[in-house]
Swiss-Prot record:
Transmembrane segments: none annotated. Homodimer. Interacts with SinR. Residues 191-203 have a biased composition (Acidic residues). The gene is hpr. This is DNA-binding transcriptional repressor ScoC. NCBIfam families: PRK13777.1 (NF010349). It comes from Bacillus subtilis (strain 168). Residues 63-86 bind DNA. InterPro entries: HTH_MarR-typ (IPR000835), HTH_tscrpt_reg_Hpr (IPR023488), MarR/SlyA-like (IPR039422), Tscrpt_reg_MarR-type_CS (IPR023187), WH-like_DNA-bd_sf (IPR036388), WH_DNA-bd_sf (IPR036390).
Length: 203
């Protein structure tokens, strides 16, 4: 935890933290609703989709990495990963140079589901997207949210933000906009590259 150095005004601190708390809660309620609707045709929940997302971006991730970057408890990461394994979307494995940690990778079916979800994304059904439109039309771009990213970096650390930024770069590299829809690029992506040598884990 970063040390807070005085002087600071306690009233200002209260107003700021409550402003962030209440705005974040309101924003999350809208995000959660739209996220759930996006996933509904695939019978996935938000944690499951987040796990697929992280496994794709890291080309295989440990349960502890999923918990860290997915902002969830280790047991939550493991239990939902097992459910995804049962559906054929993930496979569990051990790295030959790291027998302690359990890793998950997307299966071919899991990768197809992940790609399909992105291709089905419709921004017109997203309240955050629609709420940003006045700013987009005024400045010609979406809000950068640099201040929020700075705060998240100081709360969760550089590793968290590096994965976050990498995930956005990967989407930019792996997909293109075609007639208002995302389409997978024909070229090989990072997810197609061979991962470290793994051995399967018996369920």
């Amino acid at each position: 935890m970063n040390r807070v150095e005085p002087p600071y005004d306690v009233k200002e601190a209260l107003v700021f933290t409550q402003k962030m708390a209440q705005l974040s809660k309101a924003l999350w309620k809208s995000i959660e609703k739209d996220w759930q609707q996006w996933l509904k045709p695939y019978d996935l929940n938000i944690n499951e989709h987040h796990i697929l997302w992280i496994a794709y971006q890291l080309n295989g991730a440990s349960i502890s990495e999923i918990a860290k970057f997915g902002v969830m408890h280790v047991s939550t990461a493991f239990n939902f990963s097992k459910k995804l394994e049962e559906r054929g979307y993930l496979r569990f494995s051990k790295r030959l140079n790291d027998k302690r940690n359990t890793y998950v990778q997307l299966t071919e079916e899991g990768t197809e589901v992940f790609w399909s979800l992105l291709e089905e994304f419709d921004p017109t059904r997203n309240a955050v997207f629609k709420g940003s439109q006045p700013l987009y039309h005024l400045f010609g771009k979406f809000p950068e949210v640099a201040e929020m990213m700075c705060m998240i970096r100081h709360i969760y650390g550089d590793d968290f933000m590096e994965i976050f930024e990498t995930s956005l770069t990967n989407i930019d590299n792996d997909f293109e906009s075609v007639n208002g829809k995302l389409k997978k690029k024909a070229k090989d992506s990072a997810a197609d590259e061979p991962a470290e040598e793994l051995e399967p884990v018996n369920s």
